[in-house]
Swiss-Prot record:
Name of the molecule in the record: Uncharacterized protein 373L
Organism (species): Invertebrate iridescent virus 6
Motif (Bipartite nuclear localization signal): 207-224
InterPro entries: DUF5772
A Pfam family annotated for this UniProt entry: DUF5772
Organism superkingdom: Viruses
């Protein structure tokens, strides 16, 4: 009987010790991951405006290679690396720790004007391309070559851009969504219009097209308020992996 009691105590000791060790290990991992999350100090100023203290995000470089992008940026005086694959997302980019913990919901609402585009250095490594064209509806596109720095007026730009070919004579496309069809080849537009007859007006239509020297883009047409609104993007959603 005594041997059974001693054996039981010994087994329980081993189990409890192991459980305790594993529990502490999990807690330490969670604490480590928590420290990696770029939390921002939000304060309320005298005029009731929410401000961010010393937590400005500064992009260092953007390197484009194939269908992926690599961004190095500084946050809170620490250097991070961002990997930007071609994936679709409800967000323009996702923020995750290197262990895969998604913290987008906690951080995305604080990024906005604190995401500093000024001074970003562009590096285009894709064969056959040497420039990027940044564009947003209602504004003239800005074309930057490799090793150029983004000007300050791009700080509020949507992250829609096209790769531009080497030694290409660039004539900026017309400004405004109603003239976007001028940049699309006629035969491609005819194909798109044929497809719209067979699909519901509320379904997005994706079709590959080529725009005079730019890389292949997706043309999406969505029925909104009884008219088609054309939107062109690269489906480059930003997935940020923190080091």
């Amino acid at each position: 009987m005594i041997e059974i009691i001693i054996s039981t105590i010994f087994i329980l000791y081993i189990l409890l010790t192991k459980y305790k060790y594993e529990t502490l290990k999990v807690i330490r991992t969670l604490m480590k991951n928590y420290k990696e999350i770029p939390l921002q100090n939000i304060t309320l100023s005298e005029n009731n405006e929410v401000t961010v203290e010393d937590k400005r995000i500064k992009i260092v470089t953007i390197t484009i290679h194939g269908n992926k992008h690599m961004v190095k940026y500084k946050f809170n005086n620490k250097l991070f690396t961002a990997l930007l694959p071609c994936t679709e997302s409800e967000y323009q980019f996702h923020i995750t720790t290197k262990n895969g913990i998604d913290v987008t919901e906690n951080v995305i609402k604080f990024m906005g004007p604190n995401y500093d585009f000024y001074g970003v250095k562009i590096k285009v490594n894709e064969i056959g391309y040497d420039s990027l064209m940044f564009h947003r509806p209602g504004k003239e596109p800005t074309i930057l070559k490799s090793d150029d720095y983004l000007p300050n007026n791009l700080s509020d730009y949507q992250w829609d851009f096209s790769l531009v070919g080497l030694n290409q004579n660039i004539s900026p496309p017309p400004v405004g969504e109603e003239t976007a069809s001028n940049t699309v080849e006629e035969n491609t537009m005819e194909n798109i219009l044929k497809e719209t007859k067979n699909l519901s007006q509320n379904i997005l239509i994706q079709k590959k097209t080529s725009i005079s020297g730019y890389k292949t883009l997706d043309v999406k047409r969505k029925f909104v308020k009884r008219k088609f609104v054309k939107r062109i993007n690269l489906n480059y959603s930003f997935l940020i992996l923190l080091n």
